């Protein structure tokens, strides 16, 4: 179970971090285009 939990956390971070990075870039680009 511990290995499965660690694998789940690692996968979640692998997905969440790049997604958050892309969202930040999108928000910055959108705010720049609006202003």
UniProtKB/Swiss-Prot annotation:
This protein's UniProt keywords: Chloroplast, Membrane, Photosynthesis, Photosystem II, Plastid, Reaction center, Thylakoid, Transmembrane, Transmembrane helix
Q: Does the keyword Transmembrane helix apply?
A: yes
Where does it reside?
Answer: Plastid, Chloroplast thylakoid membrane
- Is DNA-binding set as a keyword in this record? no
Name listed for the protein in its UniProt record: Photosystem II reaction center protein M
Source organism superkingdom: Eukaryota
Q: How does it sit in the membrane?
A: Single-pass membrane protein
NCBIfam families cross-referenced by the UniProt entry = PS_II_psbM
**Coiled coil (UniProt feature):** none
GO BP annotations, alphabetical order: photosynthesis, light reaction
Q: Please state the protein's primary subcellular location.
A: plastid
Instruction: Output the Pfam families linked to this UniProt entry.
Output: PsbM
| Function per UniProt | One of the components of the core complex of photosystem II (PSII). PSII is a light-driven water:plastoquinone oxidoreductase that uses light energy to abstract electrons from H(2)O, generating O(2) and a proton gradient subsequently used for ATP formation. It consists of a core antenna complex that captures photons, and an electron transfer chain that converts photonic excitation into a charge separation. This subunit is found at the monomer-monomer interface.
Cellular component aspect of the GO annotation: chloroplast thylakoid membrane; photosystem II
Describe the protein's quaternary organization and the partners it interacts with. Answer: PSII is composed of 1 copy each of membrane proteins PsbA, PsbB, PsbC, PsbD, PsbE, PsbF, PsbH, PsbI, PsbJ, PsbK, PsbL, PsbM, PsbT, PsbX, PsbY, PsbZ, Psb30/Ycf12, at least 3 peripheral proteins of the oxygen-evolving complex and a large number of cofactors. It forms dimeric complexes.
InterPro entries in alphabetical order? PSII_PsbM, PSII_PsbM_sf
Q: Which family does it belong to?
A: Belongs to the PsbM family.
> Any stretches that span the bilayer, and where are they?
5-25
